[in-house]
């Protein structure tokens, strides 16, 4: 498992899957009013496919809950619109070198050593981004720290 760079915030962390087919890149939200605690993209390498993701805090029980979307419409959208473009949703965890799992922390926190997205691989295989000329390798559910974006 990878070790995050000292001083790297979650908002600047970049992760890779074990097969080198995906890159998960966090980017700053920079808004105290935002409902999300983190924003990220998941790039299917060697394709033009890039998915948008958000992590939101959820209470009872306390969880960091993520959503991964592809080509969602902008503006005033319905729940059906969001469901149609959602590829995956679920808990988002950090995993340290000891294998200890915790909720992914907000963007200002130190970068996690690994990010665990349970079930993301099977969800991608069942989605609109899977197939010839698209994603052909399903990511492992754990992505390891790769670098800190500048």
Spell out what each predicted region is.
Residues 15-18, 24, 64, 77-85, ...:
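Extracellular/mature segments of secreted proteins
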Residues 34-83, 146-150:
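Central antiparallel beta-sheet cores of small beta-barrel/beta-sandwich binding domains
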Residues 1-3, 57-60, 69-73, 132-138:
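Short, intrinsically disordered, charge-biased short linear motifs at domain edges
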Residues 88-89, 100:
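Long, ordered, amphipathic alpha-helical scaffolds
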Residues 95-150:
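Glycine-rich, aromatic-bearing surface loops/beta-hairpins
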Residues 2-14:
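N-terminal helix-cap/turn-to-beta initiation motif at the start of protein domains
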Residues 12-39:
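Short, solvent-exposed loop/hinge segments that bridge or flank secondary-structure elements
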Residues 22-28, 51-53, 102-106:
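Broad, structure-driven detector of short, well-ordered beta-strand segments within folded domains
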């Amino acid at each position: 498992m990878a070790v995050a760079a000292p001083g790297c915030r979650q908002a600047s962390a970049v992760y890779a899957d074990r097969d080198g087919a995906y890159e998960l890149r966090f980017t700053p939200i920079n808004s105290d009013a935002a409902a999300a605690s983190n924003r990220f993209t998941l790039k299917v390498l060697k394709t033009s496919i890039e998915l948008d993701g958000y992590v939101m805090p959820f209470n009872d029980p306390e969880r960091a809950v993520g959503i991964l979307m592809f080509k969602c419409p902008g503006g005033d959208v319905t729940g059906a619109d969001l469901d149609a473009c959602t590829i995956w949703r679920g808990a988002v965890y950090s995993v340290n070198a000891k294998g200890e799992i915790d909720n992914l922390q907000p963007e200002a926190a130190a970068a996690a050593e690994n990010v665990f997205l349970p079930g993301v691989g099977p969800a991608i295989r069942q989605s609109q981004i899977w197939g010839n000329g698209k994603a052909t390798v399903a990511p492992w559910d754990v992505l390891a720290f790769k670098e800190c974006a500048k």
